């Protein structure tokens, strides 16, 4: 009896101890103290939840990642110091289910995959208490304040300080420094380090990425076989390593709900950064993106301005802002991605098995079968002698075409990550020839040297031209059109590598899609971990896009709209593409005027010696990134415009002296013998006659794309240009295909501070206007932008007109919805989220429409207006501040030819 009572007392005490420990873990989101709790004997008749708690208590404060972990879903092992929890992914080192975060399952093509992945992650993470909104004590959450660290870590209270990790912990693991053995020991031995708060923007001189002490390498935590491990990589190996590291780390660690929970914190951080940025730059050469110093074609005239600071790097800040906006859009739309129509997603998924039957995507006559027949899906743990997927028509593999502006560089990655069961083609649209301001006739009559300073005062005309991806031709036959034979030249994966191997390229050129792939696995060390979409690491197989470097800069106006060609010769991973001896005349370079992550030119050698193990890790990580986004393809073709020869000759006659020879054709414009002012003259011609004659031509054949989404570009185009762009989209879509568009208004709606006299609401607003003076100042800036937009032929409220344009072009089944976000609410989380979205668009339009800081709107100070606006409204609700509207349109192309 005595022993039974003692046992009951012990059980009751332990139960109370478990309750307190569990509550502390959930409320603080931190590991418990290092006290070792008493060992508890599991009761045979206990239920699953109690058994889980007893096992956690029996294991003490945590096991390391390298220890043997149970596969039982009832057990969740945590580390005492949560070394993996301090990783950039912010996830504890627990054993994940086999299908969680794994690439093979996340990239499945069943109909539920598109919407279930994000829900699965949220549900799984909420069970272990990672989500802030599941806790009762928000004050102690690691997300709610500045970055924190464990007691034994070197704590740094400055959130902008760079994070470092001891580099000698890498490469000393079991198996002679092998990849998996070393990383397991790294997770085991790694000291706790500072946790980064994804809801705060870093300083311009710091980095979100984890760097080694030497600064030559970065570290990333990725999920391998259901366990998070740390990989060290060389950022100079691939210029996109840093950007992909930041992108994946944010998406794996943060959920759409965070955009609401931390809306106030994000808004404050954004306003603080924006104020410092505008005060330091004083609107000199303001244009999105913020990272202007990394634009490849900025010339010496720009760098002479006092506000230009080459030491400031806003690339990671800009990337994080884009990720915040994409996340908030998903939350506001309650969708899995900014591809907002779930019905269209279901139709595209249903279409996949039927439309791909003609390609006969079967494996050769062996007993081994690959469960998912979709091309380019990486099969994990595949043997070297296993059959490979066959090649199918690359154009048939495109499900969604994203047409985006140049500065939205993460849009394609985000859509591919959020819609893993659909194949995404990313095409950057350069509409600068349509947006050239031809009103300044005096400037057009000046020579090139006189024109440059004048054009530099108006950045929205200047920046899009520098490094322009536009190409103007005189004959429709000169337009490059993507097809099955040349797709291997213009399609790239997320790591800027050719999407096809040489063998696949040769077979595609023959249009033979049903033969097996024969490769020698002995000559390819990555044969077991590489799909057809991943080029091998050999020097004869790897082909990358040409990366712009400082050595390739030319004069911006001499190079104006000049057709360039990419270098297609085979290079190794460590060879700069800019020194390729072979140049193809059939493709254009991959120009990135808004490059996010700055890195040294590929021609510069790293100061450290690369080991064989490090090269292996770089190659492995590159392939891992491509497998993670294996449904992403980038179309590396310029935006092509057709200018008729008659118009071109007449414009040249007006712009050139009689004794000057005529301009050469666009085909030969890349020749070294071309005239210095050729690009400038072509730009003048386009500026003068573009509104009537310049015709856009998308590089896709008619009736080839199942669905097209085109956000963010409509506010820059007039009504007639809407029709021209929609006609091209209509032509490219297959019968029965879909077109989606997103467009915001250029000004705030329903604000009563500028209402008509006699209106009761306007009089009430004006009577209380003394409380919110910055709202009236904000409306003055919108009025100035509206006048500028009207002068350029733009619609102030495109949400009222774009739907009609879809109907005029020939689309049917048009569905539209307007999302109205109330502004002026600085008292609720939803109000802060609305303000963040509206303030971002306000800032973008202000710097784009009114770039000249010397003449701001009357009685306004745009440099400090954003901060004053927030400080005046914080904790209050301005009922008369109006609302910010965004239109979402989805339309279908008729299945039968449309006749009007």
Swiss-Prot record:
Bias (Low complexity) ranges: 63-76, 103-127, 528-537, 570-601, 665-676
Disordered as annotated region, ranges: 1-84, 103-160, 512-556, 568-613, 648-676
Compositionally skewed regions (Basic residues) per UniProt: 129-143, 543-553
SUPFAM superfamilies according to UniProt: S-adenosyl-L-methionine-dependent methyltransferases
InterPro entries reported for this sequence: SAM-dependent_MTases_sf (IPR029063)
Biased composition (Polar residues): 17-27
Biased composition annotated in UniProt, kind: Basic and acidic residues: 1-16, 30-58
Keyword Mitochondrion: no
UniProt keyword annotations, A-Z: Phosphoprotein
Claim: Phosphoprotein is one of the keywords in the record: yes
Modification Phosphoserine, positions: 105
Note: Present with 623 molecules/cell in log phase SD medium.
Entry protein name: Uncharacterized protein YBR225W
Naturally occurring in which organism (per UniProt): Saccharomyces cerevisiae (strain ATCC 204508 / S288c) (Baker's yeast)
Taxon lineage: Eukaryota, Fungi, Dikarya, Ascomycota, Saccharomycotina
């Amino acid at each position: 009896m005595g022993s039974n009572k003692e046992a009951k007392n012990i059980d009751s005490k332990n139960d109370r101890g478990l309750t307190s420990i569990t509550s502390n873990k959930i409320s603080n989101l931190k590991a418990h103290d290092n006290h070792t709790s008493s060992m508890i004997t599991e009761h045979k008749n206990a239920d699953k939840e109690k058994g889980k708690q007893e096992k956690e208590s029996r294991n003490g404060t945590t096991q390391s990642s390298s220890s043997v972990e149970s596969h039982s879903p009832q057990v969740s092992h945590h580390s005492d110091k949560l070394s993996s929890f301090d990783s950039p992914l912010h996830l504890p080192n627990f054993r994940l289910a086999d299908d969680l975060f794994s690439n093979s399952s996340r990239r499945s093509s069943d109909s539920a995959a598109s919407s279930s992945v994000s829900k699965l992650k949220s549900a799984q993470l909420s069970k272990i208490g990672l989500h802030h909104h599941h806790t009762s004590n928000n004050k102690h959450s690691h997300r709610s304040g500045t970055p924190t660290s464990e007691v034994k870590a070197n704590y740094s209270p400055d959130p902008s300080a760079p994070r470092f990790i001891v580099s000698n912990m890498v490469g000393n693991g079991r198996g002679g420094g092998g990849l998996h053995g070393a990383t397991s020991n790294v997770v085991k031995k790694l000291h706790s380090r500072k946790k980064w708060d994804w809801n705060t923007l870093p300083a311009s001189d710091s980095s979100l990425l984890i760097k080694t002490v030497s600064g030559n390498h970065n570290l990333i935590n990725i999920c391998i076989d259901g366990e998070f491990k740390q990989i060290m990589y060389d950022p100079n190996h691939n210029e996109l390593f840093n950007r992909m590291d930041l992108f994946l780390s944010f998406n794996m660690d943060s959920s759409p709900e965070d955009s609401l929970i931390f809306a106030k914190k994000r808004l404050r951080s954004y306003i603080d950064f924006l104020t410092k940025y505008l005060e330091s730059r004083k609107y000199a050469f303001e244009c999105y993106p913020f990272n202007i110093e990394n634009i490849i074609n900025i010339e010496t005239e720009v760098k002479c301005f006092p506000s230009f600071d080459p030491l400031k790097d806003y690339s990671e800040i800009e990337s994080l802002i884009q990720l915040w906006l994409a996340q908030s859009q998903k939350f506001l739309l309650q969708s899995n991605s900014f591809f907002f129509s779930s019905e269209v997603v279901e139709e595209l998924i249903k279409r996949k098995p039927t439309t791909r039957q003609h390609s006969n995507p079967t494996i050769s006559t062996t007993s081994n079968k690959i469960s998912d027949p979709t091309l380019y899906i990486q099969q994990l743990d595949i043997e070297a002698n296993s059959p490979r997927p066959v090649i199918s028509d690359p154009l048939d593999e495109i499900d969604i075409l994203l047409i985006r502006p140049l500065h939205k560089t993460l849009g394609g990655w985000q859509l591919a990550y959020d819609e893993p069961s659909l194949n995404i083609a990313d095409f950057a649209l350069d509409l600068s020839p349509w947006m050239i301001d031809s009103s300044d006739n005096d400037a057009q009559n000046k020579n090139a040297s006189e024109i440059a300073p004048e054009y530099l005062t108006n950045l929205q005309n200047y920046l899009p031209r520098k490094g322009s991806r536009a190409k103007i031709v005189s004959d429709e036959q000169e337009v490059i059109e993507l097809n099955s034979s040349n797709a291997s030249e213009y399609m790239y994966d997320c790591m800027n590598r050719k999407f096809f191997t040489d063998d696949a390229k040769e077979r595609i050129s023959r249009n033979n899609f049903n033969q097996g792939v024969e490769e020698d696995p002995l000559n390819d060390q990555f044969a077991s971990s590489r799909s057809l979409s991943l080029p091998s690491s050999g020097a004869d197989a790897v082909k990358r896009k040409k990366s712009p470097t400082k050595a390739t800069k030319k004069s911006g106006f001499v190079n104006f709209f000049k057709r360039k060609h990419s270098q297609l010769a085979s290079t190794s991973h460590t060879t700069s593409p800019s020194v390729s001896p072979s140049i193809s005349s059939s493709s254009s370079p991959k120009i990135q005027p808004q490059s996010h992550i700055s890195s040294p030119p590929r021609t510069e050698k790293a100061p450290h010696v690369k080991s064989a193990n490090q090269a292996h890790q770089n190659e492995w990580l590159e392939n891992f990134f491509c497998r993670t986004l294996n449904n992403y393809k980038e179309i590396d073709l310029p935006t092509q415009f057709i200018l008729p020869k008659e118009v071109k000759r007449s414009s040249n006659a007006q712009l050139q002296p009689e004794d000057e020879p005529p301009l050469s054709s666009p085909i030969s414009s890349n020749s070294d013998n071309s005239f210095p002012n050729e690009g400038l003259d072509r730009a003048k011609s386009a500026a003068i006659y573009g509104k009537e004659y310049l015709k856009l031509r998308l590089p896709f054949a008619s009736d080839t794309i199942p669905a097209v989404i085109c956000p963010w570009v409509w506010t820059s185009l007039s009504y007639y240009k809407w029709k021209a762009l929609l006609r091209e989209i209509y032509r490219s879509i297959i019968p029965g295909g879909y077109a989606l568009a997103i467009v915001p208004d250029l000004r705030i709606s329903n604000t009563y501070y500028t209402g008509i006299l006699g209106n009761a609401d306007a009089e009430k607003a004006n009577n209380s206007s003394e409380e919110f003076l910055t709202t009236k100042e904000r409306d003055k800036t919108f009025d100035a932008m509206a006048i500028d937009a009207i002068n350029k032929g733009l619609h102030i409220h495109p949400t009222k007109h774009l739907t009609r344009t879809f109907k005029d072009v020939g689309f049917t089944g048009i569905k539209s919805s307007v999302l109205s976000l109330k502004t002026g609410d600085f008292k609720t989380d939803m109000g802060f989220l609305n303000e963040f979205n509206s303030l971002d668009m306000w800032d973008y339009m202000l710097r784009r429409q009114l770039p000249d800081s010397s003449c701001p709107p009357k009685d306004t100070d745009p440099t400090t207006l954003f901060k004053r606006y927030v400080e005046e409204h914080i904790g209050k609700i301005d009922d008369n501040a109006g609302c910010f509207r965004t239109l979402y349109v989805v339309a279908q192309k008729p299945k039968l030819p449309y006749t009007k």
